[in-house]
Amino acid sequence: MKTAGGAVALVRNFSGLAREFKDGELFSRMLETLSGEAYFAGLANRLEREKITPVFYGGEGYPKAWLTLADAPLCLYAKGELSLLKDELFAVVGSRRTVDSARKLGGKIAEELTARFAVLTGSADGGDETALRGALDGGKAVCLLAGGFGFAPKENPLLVRVEKEGLLLSACPLDTPVRVFSYEYRNKLLAAMSVGVLVLGAAEKSGALITAKYAAAMCKKLFAIPYAPSVLAGAGCNQLIKNGAYLTETANDILEKYGYEGVEKKKIPLTETEEKAVEFITERGEAHVSEISSALNIPTYRLATMLSALEVKGAVVKLGGNRYSVV
């Protein structure tokens, strides 16, 4: 109420603001700038120069789900493959501290989801980044920034790739910096424009849970990757599952909820010894190098080479402390 009262007072006394700015000098300059053609001509030239397409409220390509939001942006700025706005969007998000095994799995799921959806995510390190890479490999990646294009890190090779191969979006004016509150608003928009959300990793208090909160409030399907109870970086995911989110281990767990046929699992060519190693790790969930070496009777120096090969093939992922799990 204090904020609203301040805003009301500001509007009521707006005419008096001119006197505060050197008898209206600054006010007049602002009014002149916005009233003249030069400002808008400069903006149009910048949009064309930077290959940014404005998508206006209610216009073609504007997310229909945003039209129901009281605080919907008046304009969506886009760079890249605009046709992806016509696809069904599925959001895959995760905290910066998403563990390696979940990131590996999340990237694979994101890639396979592109068989039916365009995958939507943010641009943060960790879960968002791995989802973005997987979606790019699948050919349908959409990234929604928290700030304006003027503040997007131009040296970020991943975002450059999104511009060229996917679609980069911003709901903010070009030179809007990222503030603390920017992420929650972005996450709300992300949840609204997607048909569902998968959370790859989230502690008890994580930005990824904000996206999940809005998705649940909007009656979107919610999915989460399960974690061992001892992994604090996944406590938020486990809580989502307890609260009704779908436990997710493969892309098929998601696709089937939308009535789509599952993606056929690719057979990874393995040697007999590699198959035994994968089987051993699978039975235990994860295993230390010494345990695998003892079970297969293979010296650790030889095993290290084999495990590296299995990582390259996408069969296993290395965890901390010389431990491995299957993908």
Where are these regions (language model features)?
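Short, small/acidic-rich helices and loops at N termini and domain boundaries
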Residues: M1-G61, A224, A315-V327
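Glycine-biased, small-residue-rich flexible motifs in mid-sequence functional cores and linkers
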Residues: F56-V327
